Amino acid sequence: MGKGVAVLNSSEGVKGTIFFAQEGEGKTTVTGTVSGLKPGLHGFHVHALGDTTNGSMSTGPHFNPDGKQHGAPEDANRHAGDLGNIIVGDDGTATFTITDCQIPLSGPNSIVGRAVVVHADPDVLGKGGHELSLTTGNAGGRVACGIIGLQG
């Protein structure tokens, strides 16, 4: 089994730990807890780069090895890194489990070394009608990020 982890921090006080697990060539399960967010939906994506030299702004666009448009996790036409939204409760904390087939921990499209990013606003999943809907999900600013590393 492949395992990965990302520790999220930000200057805005958002913190979290995200775990990734993949059995063989199967789907990857993402589990995590993120705190310090405003209640509601927040876009959640794997970004192309593991570069945090300028915080989350240097993590590049959504991970998109197949050159597709932005979409929902269940859409056939979507970025590999489009993981939808996490739901934050009234206490400012999100606890979640996501299973996805496009974010492997090994091989040419591995997400290891890339960044996971939490956004300020909901991801409209490519269906919002805004010009950014098909590129970023119009999910607003980047409020926290962490680099996905291998876990022993």
Swiss-Prot record:
Gene: SODCC2
UniProt-recorded name of the protein: Superoxide dismutase [Cu-Zn] 2
Function: Destroys radicals which are normally produced within the cells and which are toxic to biological systems.
GO cellular component terms attached to this protein's record: cytoplasm
UniProt xrefs under InterPro entries: SOD-like_Cu/Zn_dom_sf, SOD_Cu/Zn_/chaperone, SOD_Cu/Zn_BS, SOD_Cu_Zn_dom
Cofactor(s) it depends on: Cu cation; Zn(2+)
Binding residues for Zn(2+): 62, 70, 79, 82
UniProt cross-references to Pfam families, sorted A to Z: Sod_Cu (PF00080)
Source organism per UniProt: Brassica juncea
Reactions listed under catalytic activity: 2 superoxide + 2 H(+) = H2O2 + O2
